[in-house]
A protein has these predicted regions:
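Positively charged n-region of N-terminal signal peptides that target proteins for export
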Residues: 1-6
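Bacterial N-terminal signal peptides
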Residues: 8-18
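Asp-box/BNR beta-propeller blade signature and adjacent active/binding-site loops
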Residues: 22-386
């Protein structure tokens, strides 16, 4: 009888421990389809951009490419969907900028201004990059939202502040065109707003050159920083390091490995671009964002990067984690193992991670999914992100 009680106790303890282990397993990522071919009468969708608004809501933006999968000049609208519950449910489609005739709008970069609470959407319009000239350039515009993405202002053209024949800056007056890298723009801790353009500085096609655009008044006025970052770059993103220096992650047109450069003097000078040997990349856009900072109460400084981790093909979109301010990326997990391209990242108010990804390829088209994942899942239970 006593032996039976002991055996029953052992079995019960084993069951309790087993259930406890199951309960402690990291939550698996959950993906939601937000934009798909055929939605809204559009044949195609591309170019994800994602941001967390000041009230904690999520805003996901995409190009609604009505007739062609190609870039500008085409009939393209910028559209958004919002979530107020961490990405579990989403609003109906919200227009940001809709094409007029053959003038389309595309390639959105998003940033939330912590000073004003406004959302800024920065994007291209009109002529395509390769059709652009100094006299008739591809335009860059801003739309603003003062209600966390529910409504948006009319597009404001800021091209004359930055490039083209109407610009007073002798450096960029003769440029043939430029566009902001889609995904995330950046607000520094002092409130300064930044985004990176890929500039076509002469009549010839590539290479493109990366330059930083800066605003110190909430995006009301902009200026071009004079130092080129990469003379053979493309879509590039910025993040502020813990020491205040800037790290730029650069699409490598040669494929192989992602490139980066550093500035310790607010963009006045830049290091020579180097390759992240631990980050293969197939000449594709991705995102880099700050995750946590020790000065804000976290145990560690952390950055996140999303990119297709493949040196040749656009597939295997993964999220990577750095503990040394972007020097190395030792933690990585694949979110979309098949064909997938551009992606955008944001941090949710509870510390979970949001990823917006175009899933598919040029043959069958792209669907755009939002994925919510936890730091525990990303690190296989090693880090809770606090």
């Amino acid at each position: 009888m006593n032996a039976m009680k002991i055996l029953s106790g052992i079995l019960l303890a084993a069951l309790v421990l087993g259930c406890g282990g199951c309960a402690g397993a990291p939550e698996e990522p959950v993906s939601t389809l937000l934009f798909a071919p055929g939605d809204g009468g559009s044949k195609y969708y591309r170019i994800p951009a994602l941001v967390t608004a000041d009230d904690g809501s999520l805003v996901a933006v995409a190009d609604r490419r009505l007739e062609s999968m190609g870039d500008l000049p085409n009939k393209i609208d910028l559209v958004a969907r919002r979530s107020t519950d961490g990405g579990r449910t989403w609003s109906s489609v919200i227009p940001i900028a809709e094409h007029r005739g053959d003038c389309g709008y595309g390639d959105a970069a998003l940033v939330s201004d912590a000073r004003s609470g406004e959302l800024l959407c920065i994007f291209a319009s009109g002529r395509g990059l390769w059709e652009s000239t100094p006299e008739a350039p591809i335009d860059i515009n801003i739309c603003r939202s003062g209600d966390f993405g529910q409504t948006w202002s009319a597009p404001e053209c800021i091209t004359p502040q930055l490039w083209g024949a109407a610009c007073a800056n002798p450096l960029s007056r003769g440029w043939y065109g430029a566009f902001a890298a889609s995904g995330r723009a950046l607000q520094l801790r002092d409130g300064t707003l930044l985004f990176v353009v890929a500039a076509r500085t002469g009549r010839a096609a590539p290479p493109l050159v990366n330059y930083v655009c800066m605003s110190e008044d909430g995006g009301r006025s902009w200026r071009l920083l004079p130092t080129p970052v990469d003379m053979n770059g493309d879509e590039a993103k910025l993040v502020e390091r813990a020491d205040g220096s800037w790290l730029m992650s650069i699409r490598n047109p040669a494929k192989g490995r992602r490139k980066y450069a550093l500035s310790a003097d607010r963009g006045a000078t830049w290091s020579e671009p180097q390759r992240w040997e631990d980050m293969p990349s197939p000449a594709c856009n991705g995102d880099i964002v700050r995750y946590t900072l020790r000065v804000e109460g976290a145990r560690r400084n952390r950055m996140l990067h999303s990119i297709p981790l493949d040196s040749v093909e656009r597939r295997n979109v993964s999220v990577l984690l750095s503990y040394d301010e972007g020097c190395t990326w030792p933690v990585r997990r694949s979110v979309w193992s098949g064909d997938a391209g551009y992606s955008s990242l944001t941090v949710l108010p509870d510390g979970d991670i949001g990823l917006l990804t175009e899933v598919g390829n040029w043959e069958r088209g792209f669907e755009i999914y939002f994925t919510r994942l936890t730091p525990e899942w990303l690190t296989r239970g090693e880090d809770d992100g606090r």
